[in-house]
Amino acid sequence: MLLNSKRQLAILLAVLSLVALVLVGRWGNARKIGGQGPAEPFRIAGNFYYVGATDVAAFLITGPEGHVVLDGGYPTTAPLIMASIAKLGFDIKDVKVLLNSEPHPDHGGGLTVLQQASGAQLWAS
C-alpha cells in the first residue's frame, strides 16, 4: 500500500494503534483464564453434548443411570464445563464417570475440580 500523504500515514498509525490496544486487552483477559472463554453448549447427536470452552473440548454423555464427562480441560476450564452442563439442564452431581482421554493438562487439568463437584469416578485411557 502506497501512502500519499502524512495524513494517510497518521490515520493508518492511529488505526493500527487502536487495533493493538484492543488485542492486548483481550489477550490479557484471555491469559487470566488460561486462554479459554465460555462456549455455548450444544447437542451433537442423541445423548452426546459439547460442554467445552472456546479452545478446549469437553463432552457430556448422558444416561438414565448417570452421566459421563469426557475430558476436563485446564483447571480454569472446569467452571465453564459445569456451567455448560447446568445450562443444558443437567446436574453435575449426576455425573458418575470422568474420562480422561490423554495425559495433557488441556484434557485432564480440570478433572480434580470436576471430581470434587460431582463425586464421580475418574477413569484414564
Describe these PLM feature segments:
Residues 16-26:
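Hydrophobic alpha-helical membrane-insertion segments, chiefly the h-region
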Residues 35-92:
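Conserved beta-strand hairpin/beta-sheet module of binuclear metal-dependent hydrolase folds
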Residues 26-37:
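Ser/Thr/Pro/Gly-rich low-complexity linker/stalk segments immediately outside membranes or between
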